[in-house]
Swiss-Prot record:
Lineage, broadest ranks: Bacteria, Bacillati, Bacillota, Clostridia, Eubacteriales
Cellular component GO terms, alphabetical: plasma membrane; proton-transporting ATP synthase complex
SUPFAM superfamilies named among the record's database cross-references: F1F0 ATP synthase subunit B, membrane domain
Record's protein name: ATP synthase subunit b
Organism: Syntrophomonas wolfei subsp. wolfei (strain DSM 2245B / Goettingen)
Topology of this chain in the membrane: Single-pass membrane protein
Its job: F(1)F(0) ATP synthase produces ATP from ADP in the presence of a proton or sodium gradient. F-type ATPases consist of two structural domains, F(1) containing the extramembraneous catalytic core and F(0) containing the membrane proton channel, linked together by a central stalk and a peripheral stalk. During catalysis, ATP synthesis in the catalytic domain of F(1) is coupled via a rotary mechanism of the central stalk subunits to proton translocation.
Main location: membrane
Domain of life, per lineage: Bacteria
Subunit composition and interactions: F-type ATPases have 2 components, F(1) - the catalytic core - and F(0) - the membrane proton channel. F(1) has five subunits: alpha(3), beta(3), gamma(1), delta(1), epsilon(1). F(0) has three main subunits: a(1), b(2) and c(10-14). The alpha and beta chains form an alternating ring which encloses part of the gamma chain. F(1) is attached to F(0) by a central stalk formed by the gamma and epsilon chains, while a peripheral stalk is formed by the delta and b chains.
C-alpha cells in the first residue's frame, strides 16, 4: 500500500520504495537462510538419501542371499530325495536278493529231501525184494522137501534155489 504524504497525495514512487526494501529484505533473508539453513538441510537430505540407498543395497543383498539360500535348499532337497530313492532302491534290491536266496535254498532243501526220500524208498524196495526172495527160497525149499519127502543135498539145494530165484525174479521184476 502506498503511504500517504502530508499533503494527502500518494507519491507515485512510494510503492517502488517499499518494493525495493522488500526485495532487499528478501535477498538478505535468502542469503542468511542459504548460509545457515541450506547447508544443514542439504546435509540432512544427503544423509537421508545415503541411508535410503544403503537400505536399498542391503535389501538387494538380503534378497540375493535369500535367493541363494532358496536355491541351496532346493538343491539339498533334490539331493535328499535322490538319496532316499537310492536307499529305497538298494533296500528293494536287497529284499529281492534275499527272497531269491531263500527260494533257492528252499528249492535246494526240497530237492535234497526228495532225493533222500527216493533213496530211502529205493533202499526199502531193494530190502523188500531181498526179504521176498529169502522167503520165496525158504518156501521153495520147504515145498521141495515135502514134495520129494526127503532132505535135499547141497548141490540139489543150490540148483533148485537158483532156478526158483530166476523164475521168481522174472515174475517180480
Amino acid at each position: 500500500m502506498p503511504v500517504p504524504q502530508p499533503d494527502g497525495k500518494t507519491p507515485a514512487f512510494g510503492n517502488l520504495y517499499a518494493i525495493g526494501w522488500s526485495a532487499v529484505n528478501f535477498l538478505v533473508l535468502l542469503a542468511l537462510m542459504y548460509k545457515f539453513a541450506y547447508g544443514p538441510i542439504n546435509n540432512m537430505l544427503e544423509q537421508r538419501t545415503n541411508a535410503i540407498e544403503g537400505s536399498l543395497k542391503h535389501a538387494e543383498e538380503v534378497k540375493l542371499e535369500v535367493e541363494q539360500m532358496r536355491k541351496e535348499t532346493a538343491s539339498n532337497l533334490a539331493e535328499s530325495r535322490k538319496e532316499a530313492q537310492e536307499i529305497v532302491a538298494r533296500a528293494t534290491k536287497a529284499a529281492e536278493e534275499s527272497k531269491n536266496e531263500i527260494i533257492a535254498k528252499a528249492k535246494e532243501e526240497s530237492t535234497l529231501i526228495k532225493n533222500k526220500a527216493a533213496a530211502e524208498i529205493q533202499a526199502a524196495t531193494e530190502q523188500a525184494k531181498l526179504e521176498l526172495k529169502d522167503s520165496a527160497v525158504s518156501l521153495a525149499i520147504l515145498a521141495a522137501e515135502k514134495v520129494l519127502s526127503r532132505a535135499i543135498n547141497d548141490d540139489d539145494h543150490k540148483n533148485l534155489v537158483k532156478q526158483f530165484v530166476n523164475e521168481a525174479g522174472d515174475l517180480l521184476c
